[in-house]
Curated annotation (Swiss-Prot):
The lineage of its organism: Bacteria, Pseudomonadati, Thermodesulfobacteriota, Desulfovibrionia, Desulfovibrionales. InterPro entries: AAA+_ATPase (IPR003593), ATPase_AAA_core (IPR003959), Lon_bac (IPR027543), Lon_bac/euk-typ (IPR004815), Lon_lid (IPR054594), Lon_proteolytic (IPR008269), Lon_Prtase (IPR027065), Lon_prtase_N (IPR003111). Homohexamer. Organized in a ring with a central cavity. It is found in: Cytoplasm. This is Lon protease. Belongs to the peptidase S16 family. Residues 633-814 form the Lon proteolytic domain. It catalyses: Hydrolysis of proteins in presence of ATP.
Length: 830
């Protein structure tokens, strides 16, 4: 319970453990007087209608003597009325102590009829009443008389215990033992109090006596008051006693632990002093002044800017006035060590030989012409203008295409140090900017740590997985990167730990990302985006032959001539055991093949080992990816679309079925909102062109259309399926079949225009990988064809269209006849 001296009717129990007296006085006097008196008022003397005194945050039990301060006007009137009519008053607790003038709904129905033993008027107008609970009672009706509340009450008689005497005695003893345990844990003498408890042999009275002296919430005390059965009431009290004993035990443990901690600190201090004396006798002691001199010397050699030097001198002066073993001195020494070890002036000399840099890039990576050209352009500019600011390049593409390893090769070609910072899953802004030195264990941010590890002012820092930065209540790391990645600001980058500006303008920042849409707009605006699309099968074959196979042979202890594998076998691995835009799975499969061969060699078989296509399944198991047989002609209502995923392009089957119905459109296959809208647009276009396409004009009312895109467990979205949806829908409505060697992509409008989409290279690669002969793309995507190698263009015929009318003649085996209105005929739908 919590008492507030400003409440109108608040118990100021000098006997309870939470009063204003000292703790020892509270505990020693609590039980002795609260046990009641021998001349308790008998229930028959109590009238049935008596004044009500609402209580805040206190419940009065039978036989308990409690002082109350009464301050509310109508409460004062109720007490004064009670003193003139038999001294009896009905005490009931408020459900909400904040209510100033409680009504019947705000009061508990069960309370205690009490006798006013003494009344004293205070100088401020309040009353101080000493009351004794004499009987539980239930309020039947409440009346408002002359400004105060009166109640018609029913006295509640306590039933006789129904348990065996032995069980009753066991409960009484356990309750007393718990009380004794609590008193002992609090260091309160138990003799007198336990004597009082031992004399109370009625379970109900003992429960009330203990409950009146426990720290109980109003709801908990009211629950005990309303419980009439004495054994049940004692059980409730024992539950609270057990909880109180556990809390007291925990308090003792905490106090003991704190005391031991203080003792240990004192012991450590004396041991340190003794250790100092021993070291001094041995001549090993390092004087604090000598240590400061060493730090100062290191700082002088660091070549600090004037602003940083000013802060460092300030910290050195503070350090010189502190005790060497103080915690603050350790923090300052660590800070000064960080300042001394950072590369304030040291830079590495750039390798400006363009031809040598080109050779290094070509040795480490196959293809990637755009990125290599961009790096060589940067070198050329640096050669002509050494003061030029470095670009901030972001390599965007699917996993496994070499974005991270490319950063290391760029650093090697430039002759610079390389540092990588993984940003995946980072949520705390302090990871970038550091923690302020006021925090225990504070450290600089990851950028400053990378600069220290690099040891030069102009390293290459790769910010890996920049699209996977998070944010929460600890801040937004992407916002903290804005300053570091802005060429106009990063010459004065501020780290919270250093609290002095640090120049990052000489750093070449590189970033990698899988999903550009996940990068915040302000951060993306500072990046020069360079896309890394997936590799073609020919590129993968060349990389496997030139880079991956030699690497795996070396890692598995094989020589180059000990494993002979043909291009056909490598193509089979690429085609049937991996399906990705990058190279990671292909490297794993080739590594698995090399391990199998290494085992044969270790078992005593003599190389060389020649791998044939028939042996691939023996070594690598059943092929994981087997393409469906491409049908020359698809069933009506089916068309092949193209989709882009972070892992590369994919073939997308779109199926449309029509049945008799009422014009409902059903879409299944986990379609996103944009794809659903594309389906609606396709349906609207088909309805608007029904006459010219020889489709029944009332098909939208007489049949239901079901559009399904297989792989239902995979979410799909985007506008690029619009052309395919329209083609499949018209195919289903006309009964015409779409060519099986044709795939398509493009956004559709209500007027039938075909709009450009993204991921053209990856989509064309998917069509080639499936063995399709034709692909339809929007005319405005013609510029993207430059990224597609010539060998791929020879394998697939690329058709560019700007309107759906250009798609239909290419899509159907037979051209759909254009029918004028005069010759319009109805054709049954499939």
């Amino acid at each position: 319970m919590t008492f507030d001296t400003n409440d109108d009717s608040i118990a100021k129990n000098s006997l309870a453990p939470y009063n204003q007296e000292t703790e020892q006085q509270q505990e020693e006097g609590a039980m002795k007087i609260n046990a009641g008196t021998e001349d308790d008022v008998q229930p028959q003397e109590i009238p049935s209608s008596i004044p009500i005194l609402p209580l805040r945050d206190v419940v009065v039990f039978n036989y308990m003597i409690v002082p109350l301060f009464v301050g509310r006007e109508r409460s004062i009137q109720a007490v004064e009325s009670a003193t003139t009519h038999g001294q009896h008053i009905f005490l009931c607790a408020q459900k909400d102590s904040q209510i100033e003038n409680p009504t019947e709904e705000d009061l508990y129905s069960v309370g205690t009829v009490a006798l006013i033993l003494r009344l004293l008027k205070m100088p401020d107008g309040r009353l101080k009443a000493l009351v004794q609970g004499i009987s539980r009672a239930r309020c039947l009706t409440i009346h408002n008389e002359d400004g105060y509340l009166t109640a018609t009450v029913e006295l509640l008689q306590e039933p006789q215990p129904t348990v065996k005497p032995t069980e009753q005695e066991a409960l009484l003893r356990y309750a007393r033992e718990q009380c004794e345990k609590i008193l002992a844990l609090r260091g309160i003498p138990t003799g007198e109090i336990m004597g009082v408890l031992s004399n109370v042999n009625e379970p109900g009275r003992l429960a009330d006596l203990i409950a009146a002296n426990l720290r109980l919430k109003t709801e908990e005390a009211q629950e005990i008051l309303q419980c009439l059965e004495p054994i049940d009431r004692l059980h409730l009290v024992i539950t609270h006693l057990t909880h109180e004993a556990e809390v007291a035990t925990m308090q003792v443990k905490i106090q003991t632990s704190a005391r031991e901690g203080m003792d240990k600190a004192q012991k450590d201090y004396f041991l340190r002093e003794q250790l100092k004396a021993i070291r001094k006798e041995l001549g090993d002691a390092i004087d604090a002044d000598e240590e400061i001199e060493e730090v100062s010397s290191a700082l002088n050699k660091a070549g600090l800017p004037a602003e940083v030097r000013k802060e460092v001198d300030k910290q050195l002066r503070r350090l010189s006035t502190m005790h060497a073993d103080s915690a603050e001195a350790g923090v300052i020494r660590t800070y000064l060590d960080w300042i001394a070890e950072l590369p304030w002036k040291k830079t590495s000399k750039d390798q400006l030989d363009i031809h040598k840099a080109k050779t290094i890039l070509n040795e480490d990576h196959y293809g990637l012409v755009k990125i290599k050209d961009r790096i060589l352009e940067y070198l050329s500019v640096r050669k002509l203008n050494p003061k030029s600011k470095g670009p901030i390049l972001c390599f965007a593409g699917p996993p496994g295409v070499g974005k991270t390893s490319l950063g290391r090769s760029i650093a090697k070609s430039l002759g610079r140090k390389f540092q990588r910072i993984s940003l995946g899953g980072m949520h705390d802004e302090a990871e970038i900017r550091g923690h302020r030195r006021t925090y225990i264990g504070a450290m600089p941010g990851r950028l400053i740590q990378a600069m220290k590890q690099a040891g030069t002012k102009n390293p290459v820092i790769l910010l890996d997985e920049i699209d996977k930065l998070g944010n929460d209540f600890r801040g937004d790391p992407s916002s903290a990167l804005l300053e570091a990645l802005d060429p106009e600001q990063n010459h004065n980058f501020s780290d919270h730990y250093l609290n002095v500006p640090f120049d990052l303008s000489k750093v070449l920042f590189l970033c990698t990302a899988n999903h550009l849409e996940h990068i915040p707009a302000a951060l993306k605006d500072r990046l020069e985006i360079i896309s890394l699309p997936g590799y073609t099968q020919q590129e993968k074959l060349a990389i496997a032959r030139k880079y991956i196979l030699p690497k795996q042979l070396k890692e598995n202890g094989l020589k180059e001539n000990e494993l002979i594998i043909s291009d056909t076998c490598l193509e089979k691995i690429i085609r049937e055991y991996t399906r990705e835009a990058g190279l990671r799975n292909m490297e794993r499969e080739i590594g698995s093949l090399c391990r199998k061969v290494a085992r044969k060699k270790a078992e005593g078989k003599k190389p060389p080992f020649r791998i044939t296509t028939n042996q691939i399944e023996k070594f690598l198991g059943i092929p994981r990816f087997i393409d469906d047989d491409t049908e020359k002609t698809l069933p009506p209502g089916v068309a092949l679309g193209l989709a882009w995923t972070p892992a590369g392009g994919e073939i997308l089957y779109i199926e449309v079925s029509t049945v008799k119905g009422k014009g409902n459109l059903l879409l299944t296959g986990q379609l996103g909102d944009v794809m659903k809208e594309s389906a609606q647009a396709a349906l609207s276009y088909a309805r608007s062109k029904a006459s010219s396409l020889n489709i029944s004009p009332d098909f939208a009312k007489s049949m239901d259309i079901h559009i399904h895109i297989p792989a239902g467990a995979t979410p799909k979205d985007g506008p690029s399926a619009g052309v395919t949806l329209t083609t499949a829908l018209i195919s289903a409505l006309t009964g015409k079949s779409v060519r099986g060697d044709l795939c398509m992509t493009g956004e559709i409008t209500l007027r039938g225009r075909v709009l450009p989409v993204g991921g053209i290279k990856e989509k064309v690669l998917a069509g080639v990988a499936r063995g399709l002969g034709h692909v339809i793309i929007p005319t405005k995507n013609t510029k993207d064809l430059e990224e597609i190698p010539q060998e791929l263009k020879k394998k697939i015929k690329i058709h560019t269209v700007s309107h759906i009318d250009e798609v239909l003649p290419l899509a159907f085996s037979e051209t759909i006849p254009v029918v004028t209105k005069k010759k319009q005929t109805k054709q049954p739908t499939s």
